[in-house]
Amino acid sequence: ENVSLIGSEENLKNFKPESLVNYYKTWYRPDMQSVVVVGDVDADAVVAKIKDLFGQLPKAENPKAKEPVVVPDNATPIVSIFTHKENQQTSVLFAVKSPAIPKQFRGLGVAMLNDLVEWLMSSMINERLQDISRTPDAPFLQANASFGDVSNDLHAFMGAVATKDGEALKGFKGLVTELERVKRYGFTPDEFERAKAKILKSYETAKNNAA
């Protein structure tokens, strides 16, 4: 299936300005926006300035409610093939869906523990995939795996491989084979210690930057 990365050319050439204005008024309203300030600043002064600049923005009248994004379940894999003339590399991506942690538990210990476990697993898997990509007979040019929320109610384990032209299936099999190895045999103590060290270092860096 041929797709455009920026949408319909006809729509871009012929849309009416009112379409943009209506979209802005519908979704870019005060109750759906935030102001983020980063830096070494006088917090009280910045808050006062923000209130001065944005405090008088009127609330939207009859605001349109956000409809939840519902991704339907599927018993068999959903497969799509996309091509684009400007894409110079073959890649395969997949996602395994699961329910997201309910909002009321996010920020609690159980959710933080889950995030930490996923972070450790991603780090260890990606280290392996990187090592494989450096071998002379690697099945892919590069590969990675990660966990993340797809929507408010949906979580997913995601993987991706980039391959030489004509080797998409070979690369995909290489990634899935390594994931199956992890499923069956887990990780080594050395892999775990390296992943733990990376995470601790990132926390230390974040702490120092916040000081």
What are these regions (language model features)?
Residues 34-93, 197-207:
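An aromatic/glycine/proline-enriched structural segment found at the starts
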Residues 23, 45-46, 58, 102-105, ...:
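Short helix/loop capping segments that flank catalytic or ligand/cofactor-binding pockets
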Residues 1-10, 32-38, 88-111, 129-211:
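M16 family metallopeptidases and their MPP-like homologs
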Residues 126:
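Active-site and adjacent loop segments of nucleotide-processing enzymes
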Residues 114, 118-122:
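Long, His/Glu/Asp-enriched segments that create or flank divalent metal/ion-associated functional microenvironments
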